[in-house]
């Protein structure tokens, strides 16, 4: 398995998601990575309005980068394959357990 993780070094990387009811919520980009096994890029997001004491629910999507290589909400795709989801979860677990990547 080969993935390249791009940790979010810029605190201003945000994206707005709109739910089925039309409610907008601002998210911070935790990090992006590319999987050679799946031939896709992925983005992991968390709500911008979370305090340090709150449990954070991270959301993951595959995405198609825009012409600048950036992520926009119109480029996001839900992950529906269980094996693909397990791979993404494994990358997230690695990120969270590695102080050099997570910035802790």
Swiss-Prot record:
It holds the Pfam family DUF1292. Disulfide bonds: none annotated. It comes from the Bacteria. NCBIfam families: PRK13678.1-4. Belongs to the UPF0473 family. This is UPF0473 protein LGAS_0424.
